[in-house]
Amino acid sequence: MCQEGLFRLALSSPRKQTACSLGERRTLAEALGLVDSTLESRRDPNSSLQKEFPQHQDEDQSRAAAPQDCLLRDVECIAQKLEASLEEIHRGAREPREEREQRTLGDALENARLEIEKLKDNLMKLKESGTTDLQRAREHNQRLDEEILALRNRVRSLDSEKKVLGEMYLTSGEKTSCQHQGELRELRQNLRRLQILCNSAEKELRYERGRSLDLKQHNSLLQEENIKIKIELKQAQEKLLDNARLHSSLTAEWKHCQQKVKELELEGLRQTQSLKSQQGLQEKLAREKSKAAEAQEKILDLQQKLDHGRQVCLSDVCILRKKQLEEEIKEAKSIEARLQQQCQEEQQRRILLDQDINELQTQVRALQDKEEQQEAVNSQQQEALRKQLERERRKCEEYVKSNQELSEKLSNLQQEKEALWQEHGRFLEQLGDHVRNYKDKHHCHKAKLQKVKDRLTHELEIRNKRIKELEDETGKLQQKIEMEKVFQGQIMAQNDILLLEKRKLLEQVTDQEELICSSKCTISAFQSKASLLDKENQQLQENCLRLMQQIGLLEQIIRSIQIRREEETVITDNAAFEILKKILPLQNSSFSGTGFVLSAENLQETELHKWEGAAAIPKSPEPLSRSQDSESGYINVTSLKETHNTQGDQKPEL
């Protein structure tokens, strides 16, 4: 019954609207005829009216044409809306809504069950992957700890080797320059090994840092997966809520259709109101036209008064005012000329207006023809609509029968629906229990993950501290290596100085040999003194051998002097004099007293220089003192040789 009432309202409203539109068109045609009659009757020769008339005419035409267009558009829109509403009603009648709701609910429940099963599988997989990842992380941490311990042991072994090498280097200062070079090569090789080990340690540290970053990324991925699982659960809950909302939305659609029908009725009322407003506008136009007629009458009265005034002025004119009148006549003539020009222009405008009026009349006739055609079409459409209404009434009767059957089915479906709602409630309770259990497990899993994360972060902090300590140790080792390099450079410089001193000594030896050759030449000249010179040479050779043997003793004495500088200075001088006396007895020696004194003085001077060097550089290393000892030994030998040569030169002179 409700559907029949709706159909009647929907079909009665277009009939009323078409009848109203036809009545409005007729009234508009009558108004246009009246306008044409007034336009033809009011073509008077007045400038003011001719200026105002085209404006009023344009306004009348625009106002008369605008409502026609609006009515046509409104009729078309209403017809389209009615067709759309009828199609929606037919579709709703063809397919019952409760069956749709049941189907959608069944599909939604099946989809929700499938999604829940998928989520459970994903959770199991994530748990298994999490346990395996934790085991791998623990194994990796153990490996890293072992590698760090191995690195520490390597560093300790390198430190011990370095200390041993330093001690060896200190003890090997007494050896020759060849041994120094060999040790330097070994040290360089060891340094290279240390550098290689440091580089390998740095690479291992970088690799450990990369592994730690990978572990952090893996933890972040696990967190993201947990978040995704939460989102999927929320989506499943939202889908269930959407399925519950579908039922309410379908009922809302039926109400919306009813509101649309009411809106269509309101639009019909609005159109009637618009027609009333148009009638009021037409009345205003008639009033304005009456006002224009009154203005024309006033203009005619004014012209009559002007003519009467001219006649009175001609009868009462005096001779004194002739000149003024002549001037006024001239002005009037000029004004008349202007008025004639204006009249000509107005005549041209009238011709144009007549042409426009003729065109408008032709347009009005064409519109009337179109209206007659539209009336015929509307009559045909009304007959077609009546036929459709009869068909629809028959269909409605069939729909009523089908609705009765559907009502019976609906009762059965409602019972089934109640059973489904009960099952749905049970399912929701089970789902709530599952969700609670899942949340509890998820919280436990979160707590475990947080504990693991805390452990990992603590271990990472400890590793970073260890890495920093190792880096500091490597920096210290590098500083030590640089210090050793500087120390090696100093040693090399000292070795170069010693080589230069050796070269100087060799030059001195060659000079002495040249002197010996010159002495041999003198000996060959003085054959008489050859025997004496041979003996002296033999004695000199013996003395040189003794001196070379006792150079070692002198070096030992100099070392003991360095250890006991302050206590045994006088004792060493006396011992040196006694040793020299023993080596070079005064009775058998060919040395003079002055040469001996010079050699003693040279020894004292060298000792004084040594004392001054030790006071100036108290913190110099031991190899420098050893080099100074060797230098002093060389100087003593050269001084003795010089004294011997001077004595040898003095003897032949004597």
Swiss-Prot record:
Residues 53-62 have a biased composition (Basic and acidic residues). The keyword Isomerase does not apply. Keywords: Coiled coil. Residues 38-65, 614-654 are annotated as: Disordered. Residues 97-244, 276-559 form a coiled coil. InterPro entries: CCD-Prefoldin_beta-like (IPR052825), DUF4686 (IPR031476). Residues 625-654 have a biased composition (Polar residues). Belongs to the prefoldin subunit beta family. This is Coiled-coil domain-containing protein 30. It comes from Mus musculus (Mouse). The gene is Ccdc30.
